[in-house]
From Swiss-Prot:
Record's protein name: Trp-8 progonadoliberin
Keyword Signal: yes
Tissue-specificity statement: Expressed in forebrain but not in testis, ovary, kidney and liver.
Domain of life: Eukaryota
Record GO terms (molecular function): gonadotropin hormone-releasing hormone activity
Alphabetically ordered keywords of this record: Amidation, Cleavage on pair of basic residues, Hormone, Pyrrolidone carboxylic acid, Secreted, Signal
Residues spanning the signal sequence: 1-24
InterPro entries, per database record: GnRH, Gonadoliberin, Gonadoliberin_I_precursor
Amino acid sequence: MSRHVTVVLLLAVVLLLSSHMSHGQHWSYGLWPGGKREVEGLQESYSEVPNEVSFTDPQHFERSIPQNRISLVREALMNWLEGENTRKKI
């Protein structure tokens, strides 16, 4: 039993250390400490985004799944009974 406890404790320590080490800041082009970006880079990226958004008409989808749960159970029961009847005929 003590062997299992030591293995679990060892795994817990490894998990804690690996999660702590993975939260380091990843440096990228144009990033300063704290995740701040240069102002010029932000202005360029915002100028690329169009100011107007075109809205389309909402699409209507037909539902192929019955909403009533009783009908689902009834259909499953009928399929099961049909399967039983075909087995008896064979």
